[in-house]
C-alpha cells in the first residue's frame, strides 16, 4: 500500500478520532475548572497535565471503546480489544500512576527536609500523576456520555 499525504489526511475525517479529540478537550477543560474551584487559582498547565479530576485517560479510552462499538459492532473483535485496553489504562491510572504520585510526595518531602542547605534537584517530582478510583469512574462516564452524544450528531 502506497502511503501518501492524501491517505494521511483521512485521519482528520476519522469520526472516532474527532470524537476522541473533542472529548479530550472537554475533559481537560472540566479538569481546569475543577482545579480552580478546589484550589481558588487558575493554572493553565492543568489543561495539559495528567492527574486530577476527572481522569482524561479514562474519558478518552472509554470514548474510543463506545465509538468503536457503534462503528464496528458490539460483538466485534476490535470492540473487545479496545475494551480490554481501556480497562488496562484505567487500572494503571488508579493503581501504578497513583502510587507514583504518592511516592513523589514522600520524595519531595525527604529532599526538602534532608537537603535544605544543598540543592540536589532543580524542581520537585511531579505529584499529581495518577487518579483516585472515583476520578477514573467519573472520567469513564464522561467518555461514554460524550461518545453517545457525538457519534449520532457528527455527520461527515
What are these regions (language model features)?
Residues 1-12:
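Short, strongly hydrophobic alpha-helical membrane anchors
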Residues 29-46:
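Membrane-interface helix-loop junction between the first two transmembrane segments
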Amino acid at each position: 500500500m502506497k502511503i501518501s499525504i492524501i491517505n494521511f489526511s483521512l485521519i482528520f475525517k476519522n469520526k472516532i478520532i474527532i470524537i476522541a479529540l473533542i472529548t479530550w478537550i472537554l475533559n481537560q477543560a472540566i479538569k481546569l475548572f475543577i482545579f480552580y474551584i478546589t484550589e481558588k487559582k487558575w493554572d493553565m498547565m492543568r489543561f495539559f497535565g495528567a492527574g486530577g479530576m476527572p481522569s482524561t485517560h479514562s474519558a478518552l479510552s472509554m470514548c474510543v471503546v463506545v465509538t468503536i462499538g457503534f462503528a464496528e459492532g458490539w460483538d466485534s473483535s476490535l470492540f473487545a480489544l479496545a475494551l480490554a485496553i481501556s480497562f488496562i489504562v484505567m487500572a494503571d491510572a488508579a493503581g501504578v500512576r497513583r502510587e507514583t504520585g504518592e511516592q513523589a510526595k514522600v520524595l519531595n518531602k525527604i529532599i526538602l527536609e534532608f537537603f535544605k542547605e544543598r540543592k540536589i534537584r532543580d524542581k520537585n517530582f511531579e505529584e499529581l500523576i495518577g487518579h483516585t478510583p472515583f476520578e477514573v469512574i467519573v472520567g469513564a462516564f464522561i467518555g461514554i456520555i460524550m461518545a453517545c452524544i457525538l457519534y449520532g450528531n457528527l455527520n461527515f
